[in-house]
């Protein structure tokens, strides 16, 4: 029996449809294999990426703040920023006499305890990444110098919070760690700390939430050595900020001995910085 044109077209159509179905099945199977391979590669690479990021972050360097000038915050509620060892004890002894002796007690706003703020925050369980037993925290260099400039108000009412805040913000200081103000490399508040400003009256902190009702008789600017990479420039910025505050708010500059700060005193501070840099160069050699 001869096969007609109609039968041939049916056979050819069946073959073409079968070929299309087979090709689609083959492509689908191949794409599954590629997808699985990509997922396995991503999963395998994930721990390594986390490890690299953790190395980039690294341990942050902490900064010690003076405990003098009436600056004695509650260390149990505040983050630890102290330097360990004999240098800290020696430094505390040297700075004990920086507190101001005022004739009349002045009402100052006290910052809300950090522990109360923490209680309001949601608690999450955090996982600690196990570190090798042999790894130890990097020791920071001992603090050698504190350069302190105290600005005392000539008015009995002291420095009012809003005016004080405006002056120091214009000088580039930003509110930060330990509830005090810091001048960073960047005016945006980034980079290393050049110098800081604390309330000269206990507890030494500021409360931004109550700044409109805040007042203080004095504030303390201080620069830590070793600290900024360019201490001379940092010191000049600190002097400029202290002078600006004194001129605008009728204040008086005093040194760490509570004596009136003169041009000779500032030059003596500059010499202390030069001596420190000379010692640093000698140690490097």
Swiss-Prot record:
SUPFAM superfamilies: Cell-division protein ZipA, C-terminal domain. Coiled coil: none annotated. Pfam families: ZipA_C. It is a single-pass type I membrane protein. Keywords: Cell cycle, Cell division, Cell inner membrane, Cell membrane, Membrane, Transmembrane, Transmembrane helix. Its main location: membrane. Residues 1 are periplasmic. The keyword Lipoprotein does not apply. NCBIfam families: septum_zipA. Interacts with FtsZ via their C-terminal domains. HAMAP family: ZipA. This is Cell division protein ZipA. It comes from Azotobacter vinelandii (strain DJ / ATCC BAA-1303). The lineage of its organism: Bacteria, Pseudomonadati, Pseudomonadota, Gammaproteobacteria, Pseudomonadales.
């Amino acid at each position: 029996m001869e096969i007609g044109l109609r039968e041939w077209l049916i056979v050819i159509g069946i073959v073409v449809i079968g070929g299309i179905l087979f090709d689609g099945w083959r492509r689908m199977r191949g794409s599954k294999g590629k997808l699985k391979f990509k997922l396995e590669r991503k999963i395998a690479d994930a721990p390594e990426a986390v490890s690299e990021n953790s190395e980039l972050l690294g341990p942050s360097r902490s900064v010690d703040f003076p405990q003098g000038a009436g600056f004695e915050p509650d260390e149990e509620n505040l983050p630890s920023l102290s330097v360990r060892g004999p240098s800290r004890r020696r430094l505390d002894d040297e700075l004990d006499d920086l507190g101001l002796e005022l004739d009349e007690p002045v009402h100052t706003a006290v910052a809300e305890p950090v522990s109360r703020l923490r209680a309001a925050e949601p608690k999450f369980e955090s996982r600690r990444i196990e570190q090798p037993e042999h790894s130890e925290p990097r020791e920071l260099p001992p603090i050698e110098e504190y350069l302190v400039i105290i600005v005392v108000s000539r008015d009995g009412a002291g420095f009012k919070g809003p005016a004080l805040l405006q002056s120091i913000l214009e000088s580039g200081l930003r509110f930060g760690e330990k509830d005090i103000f810091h001048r960073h490399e960047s005016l945006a508040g980034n980079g290393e700390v050049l110098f800081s400003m604390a309330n000269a009256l206990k507890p030494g902190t500021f409360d931004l939430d109550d700044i409109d009702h805040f007042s203080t008789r004095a504030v303390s600017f201080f620069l830590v050595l070793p600290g900024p990479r360019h201490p001379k420039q940092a010191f000049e910025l600190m002097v400029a900020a202290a002078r600006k505050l004194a001129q605008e708010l009728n204040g008086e500059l005093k040194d760490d001995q509570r004596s009136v700060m003169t041009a000779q005193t500032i030059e003596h501070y500059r010499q202390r910085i030069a001596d420190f840099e000379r010692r640093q160069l000698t140690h490097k050699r």
